[in-house]
Amino acid sequence: MQIHPLITDSKTLAQFCARIAKSPYIAVDTEFMRENSYWPDLCLVQVADEHEAAAIDPKAPGLDLSPLLDLMVDNEDVLKVFHAGGQDLEIIYNLTGKTPHPLFDTQIAAMALGLGEQIGYGNLVDAWLGVQLDKGARFTDWARRPLDKRQIDYAIGDVTYLIQIFPKMLEELRRTGRGDWLDQEMERISDPSNYENKPEEAWQRVRIASRKADVLGRLKALAAWREMEAQDKNLPRGRIVKDETLADIASHPPRTQEDLGKVRGLSATWKTNDIGNRLMLALASHAPLAKEEMPERDPKRPGLGKDGALVADLLKLLLKIRSRDINVAARLIARSDDIDALAAGVREDLAILEGWRYEQFGRDAVDLVEGRLAFAVKNGRLKMTRTQ
């Protein structure tokens, strides 16, 4: 495989993209920094096909990334291969308003092949290629220039091994009849709505004990305000106001801006500064949370009650058994919210009642809930037995 020098000019990038656009699939990875910012700071993009690989420097002055981004989001003829690509997809979405398609995520594929729920890239490379990666450069400050050869080689290794692993995984998925199992997951992670930062939904990420409509309404207004402040200033949310402080203000709202000086987690300057004024305006604009927006009393167990919670526990035990028996990560088979919904009596719009998930788990899950299936221990091994 030909490894190119770091690409820093538009002509070289356009030529590279034109060549790899003829490949049926490419491997993609990014390096970024976001410890001190709201938006991830893209520092490096690595791309490889079966014949060549390169790292692209998006910070190079005058570099036009359009050929690369067009290849990612507009070329449907090239499959894009990522490993644990959620943050890579977020970055591409932020730049283009689109997500790569079609795509393949090797971490999700590994779940279907019994390699655990969140296998790291190093372990994946070791498992499939028998190569132990040098991890010496993983804590690099990717925003700092210049990058040395060791750092660039480390970054390119993320795609040169990935491009070798993909066809092996694909062959194994086909051999085991599990290739189609991943289609729904790949469509799910490529859905652009996953990467939209909607201020009006930000409150759902803040932990708060209260379930009162007026308190949650204040939290919704405050979290939306904080989200917009963080986006505008490009600062982490916690640098604006920490979650616990936001929840405290929603639960015990100050009457005046001067009262902000008494709030734990805010400095005395909030009594008089502009950001304190904006917080108070957001607080004044709130409305009680609408009934349809109200969270369940226990968000982990929606409307289950004690018996329903026990049924959900039994379903999760069944899930462990099926995961063990078919050697597929439990997380790929069923999500906790689907299991809780099934335990609560829901029978529609559940992924576990469709396709391969129904065949491998959902049918037995319904039978367990409806009394046609029970647990049994035979020769020290937990199994399922039919009751009728």
UniProtKB/Swiss-Prot annotation:
EC number: 3.1.13.5
Record carries keyword Cytoplasm: yes
Alphabetical keyword list: Cytoplasm, Exonuclease, Hydrolase, Nuclease, tRNA processing
Stretches assigned to the HRDC domain: 212-293
Alphabetical GO biological process terms: tRNA 3'-end processing
CDD domains, per database record: RNaseD_exo
Family of this protein: Belongs to the RNase D family.
Name listed for the protein in its UniProt record: Ribonuclease D
